[in-house]
UniProtKB/Swiss-Prot annotation:
Gene responsible for this protein: rsd
GO CC annotations, alphabetized: cytoplasm
Gene3D superfamilies in UniProt: Regulator of RNA polymerase sigma(70) subunit, domain 4
Protein name: Regulator of sigma D
Protein source organism: Yersinia enterocolitica serotype O:8 / biotype 1B (strain NCTC 13174 / 8081)
Quaternary organization: Interacts with RpoD.
Pfam families: Rsd_AlgQ
Subcellular location: Cytoplasm
Entries under NCBIfam families matching the protein: PRK11718.1
Protein keywords: Cytoplasm, Transcription, Transcription regulation
Family: Belongs to the Rsd/AlgQ family.
Length: 167
């Protein structure tokens, strides 16, 4: 996921401040996810995992989801498409998929926020981390479609400079 993010950032980075901020927030989320998945339980019975790392990940997760749903998606769609765009049908497919994905991710958040992970629940938690990684990957692929559409739209809207003339 980090490699794909780096590639996307190289392709579209700098084209729009909103996209740059969004990609930066995604990177922060991925770093916090990587921190959580790297945590292993101690051998002692009932030794909790690093709750601070889990708390940080859950905080970044909610911030990322909220900014997408309440700020970024609508702005991108309005800037890129308008109500009569031929791509509107595509976003009517992507947005519901993102909404369903959000429900899956929030179920993880609700389940594992404010819970102590001990040896008895460690296996279940590790599976949940794997599942949330897959959900994030699916989400990022959907969001990448929106970002790509936005980048293409903004690129097409820029004037073409050829031999000192603006066309």
């Amino acid at each position: 996921m980090l490699n794909r993010l780096e590639s996307l950032t190289q392709r579209v980075g700098g084209s729009n401040e909103l996209i740059d901020q969004w990609l930066h927030a995604r990177k922060e989320l991925l770093v916090s996810y990587c921190t959580v998945i790297g945590i292993k339980p101690q051998k002692g019975k009932h030794t909790p995992l690093n709750e601070k790392a889990l708390e940080n990940f859950c905080h970044n997760l909610v911030d990322y989801l909220s900014s997408g749903h309440f700020h970024i998606y609508d702005r991108i769609i309005k800037q890129v498409e308008g109500a009569s765009s031929p791509k509107m049908a595509l976003t009517t497919k992507v947005y519901p998929a993102l909404k369903n994905n959000t429900q899956t991710i929030m179920a993880f958040h609700d389940r594992y926020t404010n819970i102590e992970i001990d040896d008895d629940s460690c296996t279940e938690f590790q599976q949940a981390l794997s599942d949330i990684g897959e959900a994030l990957d699916a989400r990022f692929r959907l969001e990448d479609q929106l970002i790509q559409w936005a980048a293409e739209s903004w690129q097409a809207a820029k004037p073409v400079i050829q031999a000192g003339q603006v066309k």
